[in-house]
Amino acid sequence: MSLRKRDSEMTEKIADMGMSRRLLGEYVCDLYKLRAYYLTKEADKFEKVLRHMLKAEKYCPDDRESFLETYFHTFLIKGNRKYADWILEAIRKTGNQKFIRYSEESYAVMLDKRSDLIDKMEEDINSKLYYGFALGVVLFMVAKQHSYLGDDRNALEYMRSAKACFHPKAVYMPVVDRYLEEAEA
């Protein structure tokens, strides 16, 4: 409720309560605080909690990767190099080579506007290296590169394929839907 009202003070108070931390866990409580500060644009508090979460070793590995993945791609979409850099550094520390690889390539496409990774990414797609969200991201990145090169036909095809891989609430869906609406109009 306090998140919907964008009441970061109440969210912080509830998330820091001992009972909340025991019932929901450290990760969920920290995530609520991070989200509240993000929504209320309290940059200093957001950065403090983000840095804490990036350093924290107490979260289970699946939660940690999910958090890193979601926020990393959120900041790629928004073009926020500062936070993407922080999170990419944490991703590299996971040791998960597939996760690291597609994250670094996504960074190169989204923030550095590279368009020379198509062949490499298509090899990964064809070798079935990725599935689910990760496959959707790779397909999206190939579409972006084709778009940078002015190849709208291939960009559209890859964007359609990316959409099929994403959950309807995935961070990329609004971008994909907007692209498809504009391309098909």
Q: Where are the language model's segments positioned?
A:
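Acidic, Ser/Thr-rich low-complexity segments on the non-lumenal side of membrane proteins
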Residues: 7-39
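Alpha-helical repeat scaffolds
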Residues: 9-18, 43-56, 80-95, 114-130, ...
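Structural signature of alpha-solenoid helical repeat scaffolds
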Residues: 21, 58-61, 130, 168-171
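"A position-specific structural signal for the A-helix of alpha-solenoid helical repeats
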Residues: 27-35, 66-74, 100-108, 134-144, ...
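Structured, soluble extracytoplasmic/luminal domains of envelope-associated proteins
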Residues: 38-79
